[in-house]
């Protein structure tokens, strides 16, 4: 049950309103602030009963409107006056079924939507239901032909609409001239989207420490007229920029396609006639006609006297909590009318709507640089500093040797190329892009590549329940039948008390009709009954009532609804035996404690007493793969916390069925609304230890994410509504689930197109594989840079010699071209969350780089040894060619060491990586043998074989050292790479919580005073 504070809004909602810059309208502060919100309609006996609050606290039952014989009369009933409005085209009768009462709402969470991945059974069930309803619903159906008018005009910026412009004549509407004037002032009803400058976006990939060094190297190469080096460096820069730009552009295009779900048409009253126009043509002050199935195209205020609508606001809130709307209540853009009919005056369009303001807020927040980008920039900066230090040493030595300027520039270019991994951005971006493409095949759209790294390190997943953990599809359980009543009788009566109108069918009625396949006798009898009158759910009596005629002509009244209220109907008619009463109440309490939503069923034949038939439990069952997926997630070191709008009992029962922890609490205990007496540190402990929270509002989700992040966790958050956008933005990995609203998709890092938790866990495992590839490459590439920087720096300082500049460039090219294929490597996924442990990474890379430099130095020094058979390749090779081959082989093979979690033979590389390295090794060998470069000389095949053997020996030595260091806890401690225990500054947490409560208290007082 929603509790209201002094402002008439759900308690605690003032916090989320801060996220959305306050209330843009006069009436309701947010979609969840409507005073007629219903919760847990059917739950009694241990679970909260329904509470329906009216603005005027009249306590009267909702008005029931019977169908008008024609559209003119219908409009006359709907409008505040009795003057009829001329329709452009006469419509047929709407039938006898009333359409203004709310449906049976059973959940706080989002409404049922088509489930993918559940097999074809669900689709067959839907087709069966449609066929059944078509058969049952034999009344006249409405056919309206409307005229389409288009009046394009300039789109201006959205502005605040003066109240006098909203005083449109409800019987006539706006004139065409008034519409044109308002179009010029307020523009079209289209949300303004930030147009990305693709040129600026592309150029942004040329910015960064590593990119700056590459650009400096290209300038040096051009100055030295070394066009080969210049072309290679520019090609690497373009490769990196192109891959990154194309990937993000493709992700954005996919998301743009998902946004094409807005209302396209609208029925508007203009010049005294109701006509259908493009939704973009709506202007403030327009009178819109809303009926079942209408997607509200703008914000507005209901003006029909005594109107009563049931509105689905799941596109905004992400929850299917039924909302009842009355005269003067606010309708929000993108909400859907489920039942009822009314007229409204448009108060805001485009960016001035509630959804528009929320989207603007999310867009204004901007995108952070991303942790992975920071890591790469940090690595590039450190390597750049090392390059500068090395060059200072070389310049000092050159000063004493009077080295000419041209030679110094060559030294600078050489050290710059080998000291900073020019291909690092390209390889890493390619690796993530390939991973993102793979994730897209699994229905996970990565909106920014850095989200892959964030997802790999997630330790806690805050997941909603409906549609992610459960099917979001109500199903019926085993019924309880009063003695002497058969299940088929109970089912038949319950289905007779269900809507037969397909357009307004709610989840409860749909569940009953689906279940008919298990009750063949009831299904056969259902079509033989004639519905004389039908009254949808009454929020006061908490029942649905149907008056039917049996095949024998007998008239029967059928009801279903809240169990105790249905039972009270029978008790008011006659005394029920104590045994039946006790058994009935016991079943109600038992079902409520187990989290079922239960419905009582009763009937009364003419001239007879009311007869209680029994109780039908219904629930949203877990998805078939959820329990297994949760068990798998626990094995992956991932904790899952359930955040749901459902009642605590339902949440606990779902958690029990799924094998999750059952420490699920009411979100009010967080004390976010100014109440609560737990110190801040205890609240944080409470959140950290809890397995989930029930009856949550969006601000609770935001607070849970914030608290967990303060405790040092990487947190992922799932969401689907506009109000979830701040939480998705706050989380380290924001996940928009299948069916999410546009605002949620925009705020999320990853958009899932498939339902269920398994899709998220699959993406998490894939992200860890991608992270493993990136980590292996970064260690490899840093080691290579240090290898050549140490060797060439010492060689220049000690002997004033340098490897052929072309060979240095080819070494850099070969290293990066070969390892581009690491994006397709057979990488394992870690069994626990992975993070960048930079001290350990630098420690491993430095030791490996030193060992590589020592190996190359040994080859270099023995080549100048004097005497017979004293050197490794003495008398069989030329220095530059032999060094080029030895450096190329040992560096290329190093990737086979860093890519493995264990010994290098424990995991076989992919054929793409093996093939790329083999091709590069063959090219390096041919370069060495035939001297394919400027000033090159041929090398003996004997020298080549010896270098291959020597390089393999170096490879085995480094592999052993790398494995020992990787498995050594002492090395971890020595490098200070182990993450510290999460220390909690408890006094600070207490102070912050007290400050929040004081602020909330004063804010509430100020609003009450005003």
Curated annotation (Swiss-Prot):
Residues 1-14 have a biased composition (Basic and acidic residues). Keywords: ATP-binding, Cell membrane, Hydrogen ion transport, Ion transport, Magnesium, Membrane, Metal-binding, Nucleotide-binding, Phosphoprotein, Translocase, Transmembrane, Transmembrane helix, Transport. Its EC number is 7.1.2.1. It catalyses: ATP + H2O + H(+)(in) = ADP + phosphate + 2 H(+)(out). The active site is at residue 464. GO terms for biological process: proton export across plasma membrane; proton transmembrane transport; regulation of intracellular pH. It is an enzyme of class 7 (translocase). InterPro entries: ATPase_P-typ_cation-transptr_N (IPR004014), ATPase_P-typ_cyto_dom_N (IPR023299), ATPase_P-typ_P_site (IPR018303), ATPase_P-typ_TM_dom_sf (IPR023298), ATPase_P-typ_transduc_dom_A_sf (IPR008250), HAD-like_sf (IPR036412), HAD_sf (IPR023214), P-type_ATPase_IIIA (IPR006534). It is a multi-pass membrane protein. This is Plasma membrane ATPase 2. It comes from Schizosaccharomyces pombe (strain 972 / ATCC 24843) (Fission yeast). The gene is pma2.
């Amino acid at each position: 049950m929603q509790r209201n504070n002094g402002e008439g809004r759900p308690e605690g909602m003032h916090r989320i309103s801060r996220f959305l810059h306050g209330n843009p309208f006069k009436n309701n502060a947010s979609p969840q602030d409507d005073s007629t919100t219903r919760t847990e309609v059917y739950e009694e006996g241990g679970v909260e009963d329904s509470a329906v609050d009216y603005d005027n606290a009249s306590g009267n039952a909702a008005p029931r409107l019977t169908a008008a014989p024609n559209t003119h009369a219908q409009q006359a009933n709907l409008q505040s006056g009795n003057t009829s409005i001329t329709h452009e085209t006469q419509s047929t009768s709407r039938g006898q079924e009333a359409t203004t009462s709310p449906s049976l709402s059973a959940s706080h969470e989002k409404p049922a939507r088509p489930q993918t991945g559940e097999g074809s059974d669900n689709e067959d069930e839907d087709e069966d239901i449609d066929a059944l309803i078509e058969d049952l619903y034999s009344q006249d159906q409405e056919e309206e032909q409307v005229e389409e008018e288009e009046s394009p005009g300039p789109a201006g910026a959205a502005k605040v609409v003066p109240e006098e412009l909203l005083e449109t004549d409800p019987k006539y509407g706006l004139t065409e001239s008034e519409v044109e004037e308002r179009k010029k002032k307020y523009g079209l009803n289209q949300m303004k989207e930030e147009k990305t400058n693709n040129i600026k976006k592309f150029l942004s990939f040329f910015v960064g420490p590593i990119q700056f060094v590459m650009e400096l190297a290209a300038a040096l190469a051009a100055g030295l007229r070394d066009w080969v080096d210049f072309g290679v460096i520019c090609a690497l820069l373009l490769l990196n920029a192109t891959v990154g730009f194309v990937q993000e552009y493709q992700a954005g295009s996919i998301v743009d396609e998902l946004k094409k779900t807005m209302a396209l048409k609208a029925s508007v009253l203009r010049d005294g006639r109701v006509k259908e126009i493009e939704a973009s043509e709506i202007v403030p002050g327009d009178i819109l006609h809303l009926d079942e199935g209408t997607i509200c195209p703008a914000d507005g205020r209901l003006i029909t006297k005594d109107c009563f609508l049931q509105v689905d606001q799941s596109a905004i809130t992400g929850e299917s909590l039924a909302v009842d709307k009355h005269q003067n209540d606010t309708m929000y853009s993108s909400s859907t009318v489920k039942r009822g009919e009314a007229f409204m005056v448009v108060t805001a369009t485009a960016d001035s709507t509630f959804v528009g303001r929320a989207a603007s807020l999310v867009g204004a927040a901007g995108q952070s640089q991303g942790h992975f980008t920071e890591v790469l920039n940090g690595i590039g900066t450190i390597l750049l500093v090392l390059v500068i230090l090395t060059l200072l040493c070389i310049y000092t030595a050159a000063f004493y040797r009077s080295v000419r300027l041209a030679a110094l520039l060559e030294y600078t270019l050489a050290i710059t190329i080998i000291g900073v991994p020019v291909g690092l951005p390209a390889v890493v971006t390619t690796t993530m892009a390939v991973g993102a493409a793979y994730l897209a095949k699994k229905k996970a759209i990565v909106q920014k590549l850095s989200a892959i790294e964030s997802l790999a390190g997630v330790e806690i997943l805050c997941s909603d329940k409906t549609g992610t953990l459960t099917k979001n599809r109500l199903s019926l359980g085993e019924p309880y039948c009063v003695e002497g009543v058969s299940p088929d009788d109970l089912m038949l009566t319950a289905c007779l008390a269900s809507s037969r109108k397909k357009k307004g069918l709610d989840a409860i009625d749909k569940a009953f009709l689906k279940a008919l396949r298990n009750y063949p006798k009831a299904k056969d009898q259902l079509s033989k009954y004639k519905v004389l009158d039908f009254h949808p759910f009454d929020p006061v009596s908490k029942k649905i009532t149907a008056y039917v005629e049996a095949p024998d002509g007998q008239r029967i009244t059928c009801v279903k609804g809240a169990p105790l209220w249905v039972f009270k109907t029978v008790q008011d008619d006659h005394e029920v035996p104590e045994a039946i009463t006790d058994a009935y109440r016991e079943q109600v309490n038992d079902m409520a404690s187990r989290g079922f939503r239960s419905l009582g069923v009763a009937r009364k034949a003419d001239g007879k007493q009311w007869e209680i038939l029994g109780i039908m439990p219904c629930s949203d069952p877990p998805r078939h793969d959820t329990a297994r997926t949760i068990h798998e997630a626990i094995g992956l070191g991932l904790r899952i916390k359930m955040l749901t709008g459902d009642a605590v009992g339902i949440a606990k029962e779902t958690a029990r069925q799924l094998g999750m922890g059952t420490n699920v609490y009411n979100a009010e205990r967080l004390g976010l609304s100014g109440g609560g007496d737990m110190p801040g540190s205890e609240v944080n402990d409470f959140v950290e230890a809890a397995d989930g929270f029930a009856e949550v509002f969006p601000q609770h989700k935001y607070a849970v994410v914030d608290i967990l992040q303060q405790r040092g966790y990487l947190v992922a958050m799932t969401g689907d509504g506009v109000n979830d956008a701040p939480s998705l933005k706050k989380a380290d990995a924001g996940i928009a689930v299948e069916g999410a609203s546009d605002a949620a998709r925009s705020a999320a890092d990853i958009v899932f197109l498939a339902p269920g938790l398994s899709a998220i866990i699959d993406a998490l495992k894939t992200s860890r594989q991608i992270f493993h590839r990136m980590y292996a490459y970064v260690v490899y590439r840093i080691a290579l840079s240090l290898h050549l920087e140490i060797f060439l720096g010492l060689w220049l300082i000690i002997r004033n010699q340098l490897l052929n500049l072309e060979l240095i460039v080819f070494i850099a090219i070969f290293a990066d071209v070969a390892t581009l294929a690491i994006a397709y490597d057979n990488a394992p996924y870690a069994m626990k969350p992975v993070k960048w442990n930079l001290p350990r990474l630098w420690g491993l890379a430095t030791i490996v780089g030193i060992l590589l430099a020592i190996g190359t130095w040994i080859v270099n020094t023995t080549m100048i040894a004097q005497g017979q058979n004293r050197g490794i390749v003495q008398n069989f090779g030329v220095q530059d060619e032999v060094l080029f081959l030895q450096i190329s082989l040992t560096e290329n093979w190093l990737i086979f060491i860093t890519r493995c979690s264990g010994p290098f033979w424990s995991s076989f590389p992919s054929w793409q990586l093996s093939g790329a390295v083999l091709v590069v090794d063959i090219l390096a060998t041919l370069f060495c043998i035939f001297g394919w470069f400027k000033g090159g000389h041929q090398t003996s095949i004997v020298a080549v074989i010896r270098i291959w053997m020597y390089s393999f020996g170096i490879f085995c030595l480094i592999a052993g050292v790398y494995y020992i260091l990787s498995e050594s806890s002492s090395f971890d401690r020595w490098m200070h790479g182990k993450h510290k225990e999460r220390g909690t500054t408890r006094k600070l947490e207490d102070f912050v919580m007290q400050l929040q409560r004081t602020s909330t208290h004063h804010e509430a007082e100020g609003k009450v005073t005003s």
